Curated annotation (Swiss-Prot):
SUPFAM superfamilies: EF-hand. This is Parvalbumin beta. InterPro entries: EF-hand-dom_pair, EF_Hand_1_Ca_BS, EF_hand_dom, Parvalbumin. Residues 37-72, 76-107 form the EF-hand domain. It comes from Esox lucius (Northern pike). Ca(2+) 2 binds at residues 89, 91, 93, 95, 100. In muscle, parvalbumin is thought to be involved in relaxation after contraction. It binds two calcium ions. GO terms for cellular component: axon; axon terminus; cytoplasm; dendrite.
Amino acid sequence: SFAGLKDADVAAALAACSAADSFKHKEFFAKVGLASKSLDDVKKAFYVIDQDKSGFIEEDELKLFLQNFSPSARALTDAETKAFLADGDKDGDGMIGVDEFAAMIKA
């Protein structure tokens, strides 16, 4: 795994949101252990999730968010993706920047 997360925590966090529309990002961040990580580790996680290295996490990358933690994880539903984006995108540009991502995890 990345950002120093424990495999058992990742497995438990993924299991908790395996059903469609059960993903709640704040619960996931806490369960997977990201919420308690240093800002450095949180930023490392951001750069993994930002797959096209644009400096932003776009909606299509958010949809595949869980697959960064396990290749067999499901894609997020449209409703989950939009809720995740709405909470993280504070400046309304339709993307989540690294500072927005860190603020969301540390909230």
